[in-house]
Amino acid sequence: MTRPDLNERILSLRKLRLAQCRTRTRRTIERRNGVRLEINGSWLVEFCSNDYLGLAQHFEIIAALQDAAARNGIGATASHLICGHHAIHKALEYELAEWLGYPRALLFGSGFTANLAVQQALLTKENDICVQDRLNHASLIDATRLAGCRLRRYPHLDVDGAAHQLKNAPEGAAMLATDGIFSMDGDIAPLRALSLVARTQQALMYVDDAHGIGVTGPQGRGCIAAAWLSVEEVPLQLVTLSKALGGYGAAVLGSATLIQHLAETARPYIYTTALPPAQAAAALTAIRIARRDEWRRQRLQELVERFRENSRRHGLEIMDSETPIQPLQCGDETTTMAMSAALEREGFLVNAIRPPTVPEGKSRLRVTLSALHTTEQIDTLVQALARSRDTLATEAAPVQV
């Protein structure tokens, strides 16, 4: 028997990624000051983080983390079900549930882990089905595959497509899962219409609101609250602590019955160390600031509107998004990488997003905004985007003979 050589396989795949301009590189951040990063000795203004409210370096949150670390140490030392569930975890879960209007919350180390836990614990039969938007986050897609149930995907934002998929699978338990705000397009799911489909088809509605929490809705309560929905229409939702709240971790919110079931059966919850207490303390303080500081959301929305208006004035091909995620369509990978490099030479860090993260031919620059950005930074970024587009267009133009 001759097995395939894994080293040869990965070298072959690496060559293919090089040819397709799809290799990935980690950048080492030496220092951070708000939206300014030092990389290789140079300071860049970043337009690619998820620190939407500018809380990642907030002094109150840092103080809460330091105090909790001094009292509880740097780690939880065990899983939640052994001896890793601290009083600060309980307080954070209570605050999340009260803020978002859900009976209970359950903490996880990351949104990816939480999505794995939800589907593994709920969709336990082979004929169960999870119907998802085609552009859902990879963690939702992978969770269904790992759960072993059926996966059906509908065209992006297509409510009728979701209904069709559920109608065609009447047997087995069903879940209708969607992002709240889509991480690569920045648009918002039609949650009211989808919740009606879920109710009609007796499917459990599950919303991953990683990018909505803190940013949209009353008191920053996210996309579900912005759509005037509640636990009755959306029995289960996921929020992250790592984006608008500036820290690390995630939580799933739902009825007492659902949350207790997850705590007792979800393997990614049971068999992993609890979130560090200091991170929980930081998240608790961040939530209170996010609830209190409405001006951060107002400021962020003003910057979104300014970026979009300036981009339209310069003829930039921005996608249809009213959120802090503002993608600029570039088409092929080579052009996208060239524009990203040109922006870096002008002092901006904007990442190139390429397949398989986005569909073929849909490579883009994913601009993300923060309440910490200044209007001058917004304006100069748009000017730099327009210059890099024009320069690349000139270089690509055929020579007249």
Swiss-Prot record:
The modification N6-(pyridoxal phosphate)lysine is found at K243. GO terms for biological process: biotin biosynthetic process. It is an enzyme of class 2 (transferase). Disulfide bonds: none annotated. Keywords: Biotin biosynthesis, Pyridoxal phosphate, Transferase. Gene3D superfamilies: Aspartate Aminotransferase, domain 1, Type I PLP-dependent aspartate aminotransferase-like (Major domain). Its cofactor is pyridoxal 5'-phosphate. Substrate binds at R24, H137, T357. Pyridoxal 5'-phosphate binds at G111, F112, S183, H211, T240. Pathway: Cofactor biosynthesis; biotin biosynthesis. It holds the Pfam family Aminotran_1_2. Its EC number is 2.3.1.47. It catalyses: 6-carboxyhexanoyl-[ACP] + L-alanine + H(+) = (8S)-8-amino-7-oxononanoate + holo-[ACP] + CO2. SUPFAM superfamilies: PLP-dependent transferases (SSF53383). GO terms for molecular function: 8-amino-7-oxononanoate synthase activity; pyridoxal phosphate binding. Catalyzes the decarboxylative condensation of pimeloyl-[acyl-carrier protein] and L-alanine to produce 8-amino-7-oxononanoate (AON), [acyl-carrier protein], and carbon dioxide. PANTHER family: 8-AMINO-7-OXONONANOATE SYNTHASE, CLASS II AMINOTRANSFERASE/8-AMINO-7-OXONONANOATE SYNTHASE. NCBIfam families: bioF. HAMAP family: BioF_aminotrans_2 (MF_01693). Belongs to the class-II pyridoxal-phosphate-dependent aminotransferase family. BioF subfamily. Homodimer. This is 8-amino-7-oxononanoate synthase. It comes from Xylella fastidiosa (strain M12).
